[in-house]
Structures are given as C-alpha cells and as structure tokens.
C-alpha cells in the first residue's frame, strides 16, 4: 500500500491513482513473507525529502508514541499497555499542537483523540500479516509472553 496527500489519511487506501505532489507525505504500508513468516512495516516520508514544520511536529509525536509503546512490550505486560502508551503520547502531542483542547485525562476518557487516531497501535504478526490470536482472554487483556510477535505502528490522520 503506497499513498500520498489526502489519500494517506484513508486507512488502507487502495485506488492508487493519485499524483504525488511536492509538500505531500507518502505513506508506505508494506510487508513480505520469508520462510513462511510475514513481515509488516508502515513508514511515512515527505515527497520532496523535507517535512514542513507542521508535518515534522506531528511526525515527532507519532515517533514518540511508537517508542513509548515499544518500551511497554515485555513479558508480563498486557496486550493493551503499548496501545495505552500511544494514546497518552498522541493525546498530549495533539494538545501541544493545538489540535485538541482540554485536559489530557478528560480527552482520553472521552476518546477525543479518535478523530486523529482511530485504530489500535498494532496487531499480532506471524504466519499471516494480521495473525490469529486473542487479544483478550476471559474479558481481560492478554499478557505478553516470550516469543510473541506483534507490530507497533501508530498512525495519526489529520
């Protein structure tokens, strides 16, 4: 999946018929298979090689969210802890950028961030790009265990 400009704001955009313009961002969501296992990566790049100040600011928020989530991926933590970390960082960043107004705690509780960040931070990865496996067991978030493979790919849509 490769898209740019406003089309990069459409989750899993497929048409692929728009021209790439200077000032746009290009979103690449790609994967491959190797020896029966899947890979998945999502990255964003400026078309002309340089972020605008606004693009860079939002890119930095998402990068901080990704790093915060990665820090939560460890045995004993639950599936939801990396996602919760991204929600906190992204909500705080959207407030700092003036895209959300209010108190961080209230905006998270009301899910106001979902106007910009409407999906989960990642998914299981294995023999399929979106591999099988429960995220909850008996209504509780699943604990992460050694050997589990998951993606951490927060995205914002503005």
Predicted features, each with a name:
Residues 1-158:
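Active-site neighborhoods and metal-handling regions in enzymes and metal-associated proteins
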């Amino acid at each position: 999946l490769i898209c740019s400009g406003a089309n990069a704001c459409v989750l899993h955009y497929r048409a692929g018929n728009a021209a790439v313009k200077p000032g746009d961002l290009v979103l690449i969501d790609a994967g491959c298979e190797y020896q029966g296992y899947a890979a998945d990566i999502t990255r964003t790049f400026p078309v002309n090689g340089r972020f605008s100040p606004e693009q860079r600011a939002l890119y930095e928020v998402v990068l901080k969210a990704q790093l915060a989530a990665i820090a939560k991926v460890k045995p004993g933590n639950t599936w939801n802890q990396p996602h919760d970390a991204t929600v906190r960082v992204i909500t705080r960043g959207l407030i700092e950028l003036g895209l959300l107004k209010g108190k961080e705690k209230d905006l998270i509780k009301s899910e106001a961030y979902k106007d910009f960040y409407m999906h989960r931070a990642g998914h299981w990865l294995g023999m399929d790009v979106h591999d099988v496996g429960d995220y909850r067991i008996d209504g509780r978030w699943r604990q992460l265990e050694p050997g589990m493979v998951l993606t951490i790919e927060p995205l914002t849509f503005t």
